[in-house]
Amino acid sequence: MPKRVLQGVVVSDKTDKTIVVKVERRFTHPVMKKTVRRSKNYHAHDEANAAKIGQTVFIEESRPYSKTKTWKLVEDQAAAAEAAGTAA
């Protein structure tokens, strides 16, 4: 089974090797038929302390690192865009 990958914005990077990522999802309310936005914060492992507040990042499911931390940082979009720009 493939690991889930989510995209979100870093809202906190205060703890060592941990970031908090806010992931927003949109869905149509079953009764009101209106598009609703809901967000959830995920704690993710950031081995290199690379992510900064405000960056858009991808996180993926992984083994439990602690009681609340079961996601890990895959890449941040700024670094991916920079790498693509230098490679071209």
From Swiss-Prot:
GO terms for molecular function: rRNA binding; structural constituent of ribosome. GO terms for biological process: translation. Keywords: Ribonucleoprotein, Ribosomal protein, RNA-binding, rRNA-binding. It comes from the Bacteria. Transmembrane segments: none annotated. GO terms for cellular component: cytosolic small ribosomal subunit. Part of the 30S ribosomal subunit. NCBIfam families: PRK05610.1, uS17_bact. One of the primary rRNA binding proteins, it binds specifically to the 5'-end of 16S ribosomal RNA. Belongs to the universal ribosomal protein uS17 family. PANTHER family: 40S RIBOSOMAL PROTEIN S11 FAMILY MEMBER, SMALL RIBOSOMAL SUBUNIT PROTEIN US17M. This is Small ribosomal subunit protein uS17. It comes from Methylorubrum extorquens (strain PA1). The gene is rpsQ.
